């Protein structure tokens, strides 16, 4: 994770960085992805999620002026305790559909999709859609996997949203 398995050390580092910034020091910005596909290749960063996220967020395909591909180290303490699925077992009472690509990457989208589906036990109608031969980032904007997903999503919404 963001703490590199040393949460106390990470928090101490963040506190020291905040103190330095408060005293006029430079901000420390952590880049979460390589700057380009070329940089990723040159540095051997070819793991599926790293490469595909870079391909999406660092190219015209998905790059946006306010795109969140970096963060201030001094404000990263929130990442240490963040749990996207906190209370999912009790709060997710509405119908739930999780759509995931079966090509697994290091960032954990497949695992997270399986987890949220598994934890949404309070939902009376939960469905899992696994798209074979597609990755998490393929589902962002590639016609074929988006079409496959929408073929499941549209009827689900028509049934539950009306």
Model regions and ranges:
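Short, conserved loop/helix-junction motifs that constitute active-site signature segments
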Residues: 89-92, 119-123
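Active-site nucleophile elbow and catalytic-triad environment of alpha/beta-hydrolase enzymes
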Residues: 2-8, 70-88
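Alpha/beta-hydrolase-fold enzymes
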Residues: 1-59
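Catalytic active-site module of serine/aspartate enzymes centered on a nucleophile-bearing elbow/loop
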Residues: 132-162
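Short beta-strand/loop motif that positions the catalytic acidic residue
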Residues: 91-92, 98-100
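Conserved alpha/beta-hydrolase "acid-adjacent" motif
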Residues: 80-83, 100, 104-114, 121
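Flexible loop/turn segments at secondary-structure boundaries
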Residues: 1-4, 105-108, 136-138
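Catalytic histidine neighborhood in serine/cysteine hydrolases
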Residues: 121-137
């Amino acid at each position: 994770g963001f703490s590199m398995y040393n949460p106390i050390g990470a928090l101490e580092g963040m506190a020291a960085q905040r103190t330095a910034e408060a005293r006029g020091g430079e901000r420390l910005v952590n880049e979460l992805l390589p700057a380009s596909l070329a940089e990723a290749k040159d540095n051997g960063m070819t793991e599926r999620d790293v490469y595909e996220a870079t391909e999406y967020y660092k190219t015209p395909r998905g790059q946006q002026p306010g795109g969140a591909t970096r963060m201030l180290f001094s404000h990263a303490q929130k990442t240490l305790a963040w749990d996207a699925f906190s209370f999912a077992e009790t709060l997710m009472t509405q119908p739930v559909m999780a759509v995931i690509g079966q090509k697994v990457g290091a960032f954990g989208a497949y695992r997270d999709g399986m987890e949220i589906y598994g934890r949404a036990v309070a939902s009376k109608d939960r469905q899992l859609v696994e798209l074979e031969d597609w990755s998490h980032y393929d589902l962002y904007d590639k016609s074929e996997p988006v079409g496959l997903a929408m073929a499941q999503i549209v009827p689900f919404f028509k049934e539950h949203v009306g």
